[in-house]
């Protein structure tokens, strides 16, 4: 291992990678995207992309979410930060301030008195900003749909990107909603929203 071998001169040692025990090849070696990327990197020595694609890629892997827990769905929202689900492995981490957040997760029953506060917090978030509506109450009023004091869906106050159904939805459902949001950002992502 080093700059010279026994019979040939090497620039660097050959990468070993993680071997698949079934095939004996490096993991990911049969992936078409991986092969194209590796081929371009070995041919040119660098990868060419647009700034817009690079920013969109970086944005999907570094989403900062702000909780707006209004009822029992907030308990399930807390679970995704714990070790069992570990949302940070998907590149999403909680923030306490709306000025540092990209994503707002509205979880629970939104009342008429709370609606202006929700809109004010949403307006404080920097662009591009995204909203995940979590649970039946946030999606459409839920159990309290016919109550005079409940907003029948937070989409009447703020624009919603992803709806997560359930009463309350599981932590897995919320993680799936976050992954769908990342997929949506990759598909429709632009520097300006």
From Swiss-Prot:
InterPro entries: NADH_UbQ_OxRdtase-like_20kDa (IPR006137), NADH_UQ_OxRdtase_20Kd_su (IPR006138). The keyword Ribosomal protein does not apply. Its main location: membrane. Its cofactor is [4Fe-4S] cluster. One of its GO terms (molecular function) is iron ion binding. It is a peripheral membrane protein. One of its GO terms (biological process) is aerobic respiration. Belongs to the complex I 20 kDa subunit family. NDH-1 is composed of 14 different subunits. Subunits NuoB, C, D, E, F, and G constitute the peripheral sector of the complex. This is NADH-quinone oxidoreductase subunit B. The gene is nuoB.
